[in-house]
Amino acid sequence: MSYRRGSGPSEEEMIMQQMMIKLSMGISGQCFKECVTSFSSGQMVPQEATCIQSCAKRQQSAFMAMNDIQGQLQAKQGAGMF
């Protein structure tokens, strides 16, 4: 993202960035709780890393699907169909 000199992101862009950060942190926390079961080695075992990757992909896919549905509903509302 590049901005003209002296300008920064718009308020809408900043809100979107904050929402994406919150979403990312939420996914990370949820997947960590679901997948990391032991703290004995100081490192994740391969199964935990694989679980976290799969969990994050599932969460992201679900978010994208919900986002698409929300967009469709908003389009219908804008067209006076609701």
UniProtKB/Swiss-Prot annotation:
Domain of life: Eukaryota
Record field: transmembrane: none
Protein name, UniProt field: Protein C2
Organism annotation: Sterkiella nova (Ciliate)
